[in-house]
Amino acid sequence: MAPANTLSAWSDLQSHHSKVGKTFVLKDAFKSDPERFSKFARTFTLPADISSDSPNATDILFDFSKNLVTEETLDKLVRLAEEAGVEKKRDAMFAGEKINFTEDRAVYHVALRNVSNQEMKVDGVDVMNTKGGVNEVLQHMKEFSEQVRSGEWKGYTGKKLTNIINIGIGGSDLGPVMVTEALKHYGAKDMTLRFVSNVDGTHIAEALAASDPETTLFLIASKTFTTAETITNANTAKSWFLEKTGGQGDITKHFVALSTNEAEVTKFGIDAKNMFGFESWVGGRYSVWSAIGLSVALYVGYENFHKFLAGAHAMDNHFRTAPLKENIPVLGGILSVWYSNFYNAQTHLIAPFDQYLHRFPAYLQQLSMESNGKSITSDGSAAKYTTGPIVFGEPCTNAQHSFFQLVHQGTKLIPADFILAAKSHNPISNNLHQKMLASNYLAQAEALMVGKTAEEVRAEGNVPEHLVPHKVFLGNRPTTSILVGGHIGPAELGALIVYYEHLTFTEGAIWDINSFDQWGVELGKVLAKKILKEIDEPGAGSGHDASTGGLLGAFKKYADF
């Protein structure tokens, strides 16, 4: 496809922004159009059979009305998506075509949550029902998770395994961490879950210090089983286990692999029957739906894991079939492009008003920034426009007492997403906490929109004139409010994640970049291997710049290995 800035819709949007966007005032738009909310809000409904509030369905309301757009703006943004081939690229992904063009791979994580079991093929092979395919792996996960949870699968001394340590990094860590935290309400009360990702020895040391080898199960999550950080931590865990058990511990009962490299897995000592595989068309940041989600199934139970997949599948179907103007992830994506490329916004705030979602911004950070942190378009030329935004966030109301100052009164435009569930899993104090949370969720979006003028500050009385400008809020700051109509359960969480997945897809499709590779993580890893050897050799290494050489020498001096 053509670079985004060569499309006629792009030029049209530039003119439109100059004429309308620069002078658009949100609060005036609401005053002039009482129907603005209904015109710009969209509702996604989860079926009752997977809803956390079954037998009732769950609505998820996406309010786009507090964004800096008119109906004309939205039409022009939809036309940009059409010209950029978003629908064609979407259909190619769902058809198993190799849209990851730099690695010649399909992008088929949607198959992992294909709970309706529609036929899905890559290179003519049905990935759902082939040997080692999606359904076989899911069945293996179901059987294993139920055996561990029931106590049928025991440790080497016959005790139930209640301490789960997942060792992985990147997508093999961020997804499971986020999901198990988000679904903590559904977690097994007799189970402790720990995640080790960092090669910093502190991470594995602290996890092991709090563990009993007789009741600990290790999940080693690495597709290739060669990821440096993961295998280093896995070997440390193995040594600890054998030392603590006096060499009597049975590795096959306490270690399983989420991997496809049988040779390395069995060499490590894990029984090949305890391998849970996934294909090359599963990118790391999309792998929580795969065998990498085994920790989720163990913690919340396979039935809830299946609902998690089903909620994701429901949003997949919406994205695949809804017209662009009614397509909720597409709307989120084109709004992101609008702010990034026409308002020069560099960041995007994710603020969940839900403590269980405290790792959601970090998860979305990887999803967005690893996908769209690219500067080269499909023809190999440099993009002549901004691509992926910097995604950040923290749960509210905590965030209101840290960086919200900058969001309200800083010099940068920061589009924000606010997320709230109407019902709390912990409705304590007669729902007082939930009411306070909701009031802040509503108030922050309103405050960012309406602001406060100098006249309004003066009208409050007793404000010295020299303080008036400091108490002014410019307002006109855009937000998208997402309201889950019930609790955030497995299906609701699945749908929310997939909303952001396909929003990210839409951005990348418009920017004409490959959202599915991650070459940017490679260079540092290559250099680290060289430097690791040099740390054990005399001198300050070779071939480095003066700064790196100087730092290496200083480190070796101070570390005194």
From Swiss-Prot:
Catalytic-site annotation from UniProt: 370 (proton donor), 401, 525
GO MF annotation list: carbohydrate derivative binding; glucose-6-phosphate isomerase activity; monosaccharide binding
Compartments where located: Cytoplasm, Cytosol
Positions of D-glucose 6-phosphate binding: 171-172, 222-227, 366, 370, 401, 525
UniProt keyword Cytoplasm present: yes
Domain of life: Eukaryota
Keyword Cytoplasm attached: yes
Record-listed E.C. numbers: 5.3.1.9
Catalytic reaction(s) noted: alpha-D-glucose 6-phosphate = beta-D-fructose 6-phosphate
Pathway of action: Carbohydrate degradation; glycolysis; D-glyceraldehyde 3-phosphate and glycerone phosphate from D-glucose: step 2/4
UniProt-listed SUPFAM superfamilies: SIS domain (SSF53697)
GO biological process, one term: gluconeogenesis
InterPro entries recorded: G6P_Isomerase, G6P_Isomerase_C, Phosphoglucose_isomerase_CS, SIS_dom_sf, SIS_PGI_1, SIS_PGI_2
Record keywords, A-Z: Cytoplasm, Gluconeogenesis, Glycolysis, Isomerase
Entry GO terms, CC: cytosol; mitochondrion
Function: In the cytoplasm, catalyzes the conversion of glucose-6-phosphate to fructose-6-phosphate, the second step in glycolysis, and the reverse reaction during gluconeogenesis.
Quaternary structure and interacting proteins, as annotated: Homodimer.
Family in the record: Belongs to the GPI family.
Name by which UniProt lists this protein: Glucose-6-phosphate isomerase
Species whose genome carries this gene: Neurospora crassa (strain ATCC 24698 / 74-OR23-1A / CBS 708.71 / DSM 1257 / FGSC 987)
Organism classification: Eukaryota, Fungi, Dikarya, Ascomycota, Pezizomycotina
